[in-house]
């Protein structure tokens, strides 16, 4: 038995972290959305055998227990005592270590896929709770729709569908370690924004105000470590984006535009300056 699941990239339209919990994990206050840049995850289950095997089309990902998709399969096997060998093939299109949630989305795809293959009949809410054991982005990726995400990532509140917009994603030729960036955060020194303004703009489906109130507090941290990130952000704005910012802990920067012609102009202008550039839509 096998199934293929789509694993969309995520973007942070808004990201703040007001404090760390006693266990060291950040408290998140985020607005996340999914785009049509996606990995494709084929999952095969062979009854009666045991083991987990991960294959990818890139050499940049581990294929052992460090891989989040592997962890997703192992957790479901152990929780529900399923005796089956799982073979996971990941066709990567989302850049690795980019702040786009590729690993978390792959893990969420495995949770959804095995839930179907094994007839577990678990709700998305239950899968999201399991996903939190893997990574803070997995609960959101289980749903893969625009949402307000709080806590350690476990509170996923669905929001209205965003107005139509084009998104230009630009990844420089560098990778950023999320644990390292999080370790550099000094919460009291960060300039925190108010999420209520962009939540209200989304509720009103006001594209202009959504652009006005976007923000990512971690730009202040990653930008200090990697100035190239802020240079790309400024270029995207100069080329005509209505708004631009870093996603997650970076280094990927994205810009939004209401017209495809302007978005294509931004893409063409970035070529030769930025390592990877994608033109995508919000799901």
From Swiss-Prot:
Reactions performed catalytically: 4-CDP-2-C-methyl-D-erythritol + ATP = 4-CDP-2-C-methyl-D-erythritol 2-phosphate + ADP + H(+)
Q: Where is the active site?
A: 10, 137
Q: Which InterPro entries match?
A: GHMP_kinase_C_dom, GHMP_kinase_C_sf, GHMP_kinase_N_dom, IspE, Ribosomal_Su5_D2-typ_SF, Ribsml_uS5_D2-typ_fold_subgr
Signal peptide positions on this chain:
none
User: What does the record give under GO molecular function?
Assistant: 4-(cytidine 5'-diphospho)-2-C-methyl-D-erythritol kinase activity; ATP binding
Q: Which UniProt keywords apply?
A: ATP-binding, Isoprene biosynthesis, Kinase, Nucleotide-binding, Transferase
Name a single GO biological process.
terpenoid biosynthetic process
List positions binding ATP. 95-105
Q: Which pathway does it serve?
A: Isoprenoid biosynthesis; isopentenyl diphosphate biosynthesis via DXP pathway; isopentenyl diphosphate from 1-deoxy-D-xylulose 5-phosphate: step 3/6
Identify the Pfam families for this entry. GHMP_kinases_C, GHMP_kinases_N
Instruction: State the EC number(s).
Output: 2.7.1.148
Q: What class of enzyme is it?
A: transferase
- Known function: Catalyzes the phosphorylation of the position 2 hydroxy group of 4-diphosphocytidyl-2C-methyl-D-erythritol.
Q: Name the family the entry cites.
A: Belongs to the GHMP kinase family. IspE subfamily.
Name the UniProt record assigns to this protein? 4-diphosphocytidyl-2-C-methyl-D-erythritol kinase
């Amino acid at each position: 038995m096998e199934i293929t699941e789509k694993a969309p990239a995520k973007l942070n339209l808004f990201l703040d972290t007001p404090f760390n919990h006693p266990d060291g994990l950040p408290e998140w206050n985020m607005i996340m959305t999914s785009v049509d840049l996606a990995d494709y995850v084929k999952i095969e289950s062979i009854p009666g055998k045991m083991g987990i095997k991960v294959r990818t089309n890139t050499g940049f990902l581990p294929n052992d227990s460090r891989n989040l998709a592997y962890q997703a399969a192992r957790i479901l096997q152990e929780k529900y005592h399923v005796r089956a060998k799982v073979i996971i093939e990941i066709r990567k299109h989302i850049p690795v270590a980019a702040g786009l949630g590729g690993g978390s989305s792959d893990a969420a795809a495995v949770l959804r896929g095995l839930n179907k293959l094994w007839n577990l009949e678990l709700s998305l809410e239950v899968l999201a709770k399991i996903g939190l054991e893997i990574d803070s982005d997995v609960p959101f990726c289980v749903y893969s729709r625009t949402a307000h995400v709080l806590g350690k990532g476990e509170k996923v509140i669905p929001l209205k569908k965003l107005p139509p917009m084009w998104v230009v994603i630009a990844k420089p030729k560098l990778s950023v370690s999320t644990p390292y960036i999080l370790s550099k955060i000094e919460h009291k020194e960060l300039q925190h924004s108010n999420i209520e303004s962009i939540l209200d703009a989304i509720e009103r489906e006001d594209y202009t105000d959504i652009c006005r109130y976007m923000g990512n507090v971690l730009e202040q941290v990653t930008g200090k470590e990697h100035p190239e990130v802020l240079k790309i952000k400024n270029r995207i704005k100069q080329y005509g984006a209505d708004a631009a910012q870093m996603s997650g802990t970076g280094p990927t920067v994205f810009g939004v535009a209401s017209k495809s012609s302007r978005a294509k102009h931004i893409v063409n202008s970035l070529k030769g300056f930025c390592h990877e550039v994608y033109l995508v839509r919000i799901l």
